[in-house]
Amino acid sequence: MGTPSPKDDKGEPVRFHVNRDVFSEAVSFVVKLLPQRNPQPILAGVLIDATDAGLSLAAFDYEASARTTIEATVDEPGTILVHGRLLSDIASRLPNAPIQIEVDDDGGIVLTCGSARFTLASMPVQEYPAIPEVSGDSGLVPGDDFATSIAQVAFAASRDDVTPVLTGVQLEVTGTRLSLVATDRYRVALREIPWDGGSAASEESTAALVPARTLTEVGKTFSHGGDISIAFSGSGDREIIAFTSGNKTVTSLLIKGNFPPVRRLFPEGTDHHAVVNTAELAEAVRRVSLVLDRSAPLRFTFTTDGVTMDASGGEQARASETVDAHLIGDDVTLGLNPQYLLEALTAVKSEFVRITFTSSDNANKLSPVLITSQTSVDKAGADTFKYLLQPNLLLR
């Protein structure tokens, strides 16, 4: 979408009427992806384009953009740029009445709703960057499945910008499957969902490394919609991905770099595992870890009698609790980061969880545990969620 220039320094003589709730929701959506602090003030604006077809609202910070279209009665078409978060705050608190927005003779943006009246500064439209367009290959994914898969995977991405490739979620399309993968070196989360590439479907793989923060907002925004269209476009330093559902579109600049080949870390199969009730295990972990010092691992001992959690902290504080578990194989004692385990248990989305103990050719190296969903004690879950967690060394 281009950025038309205003007719003069005071801006275009725009005037339109719009439903309060529809407008408030649209503004809230487009400003959600903007950073709280932006070094370029112009990027704090929301671009509103009023035409005979209605309103188009957009926000862009050179890395991510959000766009939506809504119905409105437009008396005088034109384009305005106004501070986004301030407009969102105002719109969410307006009385239950239609909104009128117009540009006054001094170039200010006047918003009227019932007896409430606001005059906001007009930002220079001509200085706003062009919103990126995406016209590459695309496919469809079920909205609910995609939102769930993001919630199951994105939390495992790193929050440390020192290694940018680990702050993203790798989207990989192969045939009729879309995989989402994230890792911070200490854990790996993976989920697969159906992908409909339409007539352009191919067995060749397509990969895109999307910032986890942006993808998380996409999941929240599109969690209750229908199918989501995902399109890949661009090349070199301007590779982007677009997510569209209904009248909303989000684009994101992709992270440059090679995502580590973590899929090969998942074991082909092993019978050494334990099945535990997910909620019971999570509650016990929360209780016992209360006495742990920060970053200390929680000790887990798996036997045929159940799984026992032991913790000790400062000032001689200790805690222990046992939960029923169905163990196949030898007894196991290991240390796990309780927060990382709890995040996995939240992501599993099943009544029971299967904890598989992998093995390594290196006897001196701790092998990760594999966490998957389990419908019952003896029946695996239906989804394709997998989570690898690296154990911690335990002090004797």
Regions found by a protein language model. Give the residues of each.
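Structural preference for solvent-exposed beta-strand-turn elements
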Residues: 1-396
